[in-house]
């Protein structure tokens, strides 16, 4: 690899945790939150989703990215089976404490699944 960065995933997690406070902000009353975040001085709480995640916690987006990275690093690219991804997604979800933030349907599946195979069986395309 020409420009290897062993901390890239860490930086992605940090950026996701930082930017979460600005997700979906559109109203005038949210300008203060947006302004505070854009100063880049500290992690901020989301003004609407206060129950969702405390400031500085990464989101479901990063959790899934970590799971996908684990699969690619551990299994390479020649044997990528859906079951490997499902097992790893479920493992990361449980390792992260079952964090909220996924779409309601997928959150429900992750909460109910007992295994990667069970998760795949419950998914309805």
PLM-predicted stretches and their roles:
Residues 1-125:
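Structured, active/binding-site neighborhoods that engage oxygen-rich ligands
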């Amino acid at each position: 690899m020409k420009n290897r960065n062993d901390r890239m995933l860490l930086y992605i997690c940090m950026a996701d945790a930082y930017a979460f406070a600005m997700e979906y902000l559109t109203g005038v009353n949210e300008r203060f939150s947006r302004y505070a975040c854009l100063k880049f001085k500290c992690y901020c709480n989301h003004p609407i989703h206060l129950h969702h995640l405390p400031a500085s916690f990464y989101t479901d987006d990063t959790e899934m990215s970590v799971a996908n990275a684990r699969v690619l690093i551990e299994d390479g690219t020649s044997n990528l089976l859906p079951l490997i991804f499902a097992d790893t997604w479920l493992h990361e979800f449980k390792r992260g404490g079952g964090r909220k933030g996924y779409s309601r349907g997928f959150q429900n599946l992750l909460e109910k699944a007992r295994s990667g195979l069970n998760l795949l069986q419950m998914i309805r395309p």
